[in-house]
Structure formats: structure tokens, C-alpha cells
From Swiss-Prot:
UniProt similarity note: Belongs to the WRKY group II-c family.
Short name of one Pfam family: WRKY
Residue ranges: DNA binding: 24-89
Keyword DNA-binding appears in the UniProt entry: yes
Subcellular location field: Nucleus
Gene source species: Arabidopsis thaliana (Mouse-ear cress)
GO cellular component, one term: nucleus
Name this protein carries in UniProt: Probable WRKY transcription factor 43
Keywords from the UniProt entry: DNA-binding, Nucleus, Transcription, Transcription regulation
GO MF annotations in UniProt: DNA-binding transcription factor activity; sequence-specific DNA binding
Function of the molecule: Transcription factor. Interacts specifically with the W box (5'-(T)TGAC[CT]-3'), a frequently occurring elicitor-responsive cis-acting element.
Amino acid sequence: MNGLVDSSRDKKMKNPRFSFRTKSDADILDDGYRWRKYGQKSVKNSLYPRSYYRCTQHMCNVKKQVQRLSKETSIVETTYEGIHNHPCEELMQTLTPLLHQLQFLSKFT
């Protein structure tokens, strides 16, 4: 052993991040998932605070940040960190009746 430590094993895998900007009067946009706000802070050189959210689904570690732009107040920037490990609840509520109907119709073919 030469005394050097391999830190590559100790590094935590970073979650994928992506952000987008949306023109909206509402600060919180409905994306189909349920979120719990866990923080808010003032950001240097910004008129608007940044809000922090976590997905409420058990064992899902996705987070998002939401902030209105100071220079373009009609724009909200949303940044997601991570990938959901469960289906979108709103999508499932929409699809469930359709899937039951298709299952019913398949009995006749």
C-alpha cells in the first residue's frame, strides 16, 4: 500500500438535475406529483425567495427548487434533482378507469 486513498469509492453518485423555465402567474406548477415544502431562503441579487420541496412518496428522494426570476417576473424556474421511483399519481388516477374499461372490453373479444 502506498498511502494513497482511493476516494472514488467514497464519492456519492450525484442525482441527475434538470431545470426549465415556465411563463406563469403561479409559483407552484402542477406536475402531477405531490410535494412537501421543507424550506425557503432569500437568494442574493434576487427579489424572490427560492422554495425547496421533496416528493411525499415513501422512499422517493426527488427534490425540486422553485424560484421566480427577478428580471423577468412572469417566468418561474423549476429545478428537479433525481428521478421518481414511482408512477405519477395524477396520471394513474386518469388511467385507472380507462384500464378497467379496456379490461372489461377485452372479455368480449
